[in-house]
Amino acid sequence: MMQERKQKGKILVFSSREICYLSSNFFANQIGAAFEKLGYEVTVCELSKEDDLDAKLARYIGQPYRLILDFNSLLPRMVLDDGTPYVDRLAGPFFDYILDHPLFHYQGLSSGVKNLHAIVLDEAQQKYVEKYYEKVASVHMLPLGATRAVYEGTKEPECRILFPGTYDRPDAVYQIVENAPEPLGSMMKDLIERRLADPTLPMEEAFSQHLKEEELELPAGQFALFMNSMYAVDAYVRDYFRKAALDALLAEKLPVTVFGEGWEKYSCGDGHSLRREPAVPFALSFERIAKAHVLLNVSPIFNRGMHDRVPAGMANHAVVLTDENPYLRRTFTGGKELLFYSLEKPDTLCEQAERALTDVRLREKIAASAYETFEREYTWKRRAEQILAFAEEVEA
């Protein structure tokens, strides 16, 4: 097997930064194991603040790799003593798997690194990077894979809706908007209004609409810089709709459990239907999801893509109740693999939640169909195969 791996080549996977709930380390090890199963010799390098980065990173320079992969990478920002970007000294295509909106990664994407390829979770975000970060060598759209719980156990006795995620009070986030200098503050308020009115409107399209109505034009670099400066818009929209979803469900006294950071900040009129559970490392979240009957997804930051909560629920036999967008509608069949609702119409959320909570046969049918789709399309092995195809494509 070792000889076969040497013939196939080497793959280097980084975890260059700690992402919420230690998810970067988890993703790096999951995809690394998948590459190994495909016969590649894999090195997973996890970086920390305590490391001697120069010494740790130098060992990989000049070694031939089939591909190099990182998640929300810090490496495109790193420069060697001679001024050469570190990534450009790596012998193999470097892929940065971006797990949120690329607007948050302005510094890395605009670094001018020649050997930088991006993978994003959303089709609109793919077009955004292609248009506004022209120096990025290639851009690919690929939702994350998912993992089955190691110890699935049995479903919890009470049928409840589980929402795993982070929360902050929308009014607290809005203070960033209020305190922003002009014209940034007015722009951000306008973008928020547009995105609340149309939750499937990508932020960059909202900004383009604003500029057109104001008869303003910005070169690509400045457009991307303004987007980065208006990060609070994305954060506000996310938390606004998370609060709205929970408010609607709890107003109907539907049982909801939340777990993750920040939920102590959430308050509602009727707390009897709400349970709060503490955050856990990402690797342990699948055990909790596997016990749930219904998994809620609220992700207005992916307007043409998919948050990893969706395949996580599919992999662990939880019925995924998700806000709809054009990509999800095209990729899945409502009532077969997922249940859809509209962020614009809270009553659709409550109606679908009621169906999921009360119809056992529907839950069994959807969970079984969704699991088949997961096995076919959303395993880490499948993701490894697709990333290898990207590497072949960029080197052709």
Set out the residue ranges of the language-model regions.
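Extreme N-terminal leader/targeting regions
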Residues: 1-7
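Extended catalytic core of nucleotide-activated donor transferases of GT-like folds
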Residues: 2, 12-16, 24-132, 147-151, ...
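Nucleotide-sugar donor-binding catalytic core of glycosyltransferases
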Residues: 7, 15-23, 27, 137-303, ...
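Catalytic binding pocket for nucleotide-activated donors in carbohydrate/polymer assembly enzymes
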Residues: 12-22, 26-38, 43-47, 111-112, ...
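Short, surface-exposed amphipathic charged segments that create phosphate/polyanion-binding patches used
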Residues: 109-113, 153-161, 353-357
